């Protein structure tokens, strides 16, 4: 991809602790590496280190020197300067990469980011977009692309849905990495206890979807960057006997070209996501069905970059450079 020559920028990454990164597969690491190679200055903070002082949104942020990992388990890939209190408007771009769960604390972070945006900061993805797009519920806007789905707090509704379809998946609305996802069949003796646990006795909203048999071939992560679709999807193939393809639970990632159906889905979603201030989204597709729209911290860059001659991180940093603010 062409590198856009740009004046060096100050880029703040709001991300989990850097020493916890698995550098051989971490997407935020790939973003930082690309930005550092272009001469941008990197800073890091945690979502919990955002605050409001004298009306300004500030972060306790450390400037990061990117050294690069020598091997897969090298945690000394960066050097962090002592943290200092910096207003978010002092950065050309702020990249929000904190992992879900999207709990109240996460919600407050996005509200502070929205306040910073009102003060002139450029945040990717925007705080508003992250609030608007619950990763599970967002698919309900696109029924033409989804499997039969219900959202409910009532176990009786789920039982009725199960009786209709015979084989379903149930999942919480705030999970990540495959947590809390169950497959239920009518013959399952544990239906009652699974629903009680998951729905906390009719007090927690969940989603149920008809089981999609194509999951045995994995689900696909399709990346959309600033309205442009990355031409390769990352198929996540479940381990034998496992319902979930998530890489976090041992799925295997295989990069592959997009199918015709993938293109049909992305043609509809890409311009809408861009219009909503979503610079980076990860669509999850199983077979022909859209199952999730990830906007909080989509991954998959490195697997695609290693398997195909396509630099996803360069495409992403190009998009950040195009959309950043002059400070």
Name each region found by the language model.
Residues 19-21, 25-38, 43-151:
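Conserved N-proximal alpha/beta basic substrate-recognition cap immediately N-terminal to
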Residues 1-8:
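Short, Lys/Arg-enriched N-terminal segments with co-localized hydrophobic residues
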Residues 9, 14-15, 21-24, 240-241, ...:
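ATP-dependent carboxylate activation and anion-phosphoryl transfer catalytic cores
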Residues 36, 117, 162-163, 274:
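Anion (oxyanion) recognition and catalysis
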Residues 17, 98-101, 173-175, 298:
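Short glycine-rich anion-binding loops that position phosphate/pyrophosphate groups of nucleotides
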Residues 13, 95-96, 170, 209:
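Redox-cofactor binding/interface segments in oxidoreductases and associated redox assembly factors
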């Amino acid at each position: 991809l062409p590198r856009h020559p740009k004046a060096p920028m100050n880029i703040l990454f709001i991300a989990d602790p850097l020493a916890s990164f698995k550098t051989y597969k971490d997407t935020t690491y790939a973003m930082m590496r690309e930005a550092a190679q272009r001469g941008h200055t990197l800073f890091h903070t945690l979502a919990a280190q955002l605050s409001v002082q004298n009306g300004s949104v500030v972060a306790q942020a450390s400037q990061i020197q990117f050294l690069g990992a020598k091997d897969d388990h090298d945690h000394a890939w960066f050097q962090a300067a002592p943290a200092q209190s910096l207003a978010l408007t002092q950065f050309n771009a702020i990249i929000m990469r904190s992992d879900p769960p999207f709990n109240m604390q996460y919600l407050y972070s996005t509200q502070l980011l929205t306040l910073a945006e009102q003060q002139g900061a450029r945040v990717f993805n925007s705080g508003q977009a992250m609030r608007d797009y619950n990763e599970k519920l967002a698919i309900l806007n696109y029924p033409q692309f989804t499997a039969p789905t219900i959202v409910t707090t009532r176990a009786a509704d789920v039982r009725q849905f199960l009786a209709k379809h015979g084989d379903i998946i149930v999942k919480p609305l705030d999970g990540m990495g495959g947590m809390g996802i169950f497959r239920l069949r009518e013959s399952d003796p544990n239906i009652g206890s699974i629903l009680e646990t998951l729905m906390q006795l009719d007090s927690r909203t969940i989603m149920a979807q008809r089981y999609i048999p194509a999951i045995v071939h994995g689900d696909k992560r399709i990346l959309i960057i600033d309205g442009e679709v990355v031409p390769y999807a990352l198929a996540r193939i479940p381990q034998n006997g496992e319902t979930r393809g998530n890489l976090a639970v041992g799925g295997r990632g295989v990069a592959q070209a997009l199918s015709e159906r993938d293109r049909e889905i992305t043609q509809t979603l890409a311009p809408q996501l861009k219009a909503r201030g979503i610079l980076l989204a990860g669509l999850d597709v199983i077979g022909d069905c859209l199952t999730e729209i990830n906007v909080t911290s989509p991954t998959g860059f490195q697997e695609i970059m290693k398997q195909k001659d396509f630099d996803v991180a360069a495409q992403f940093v190009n998009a950040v450079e195009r959309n950043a603010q002059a400070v």
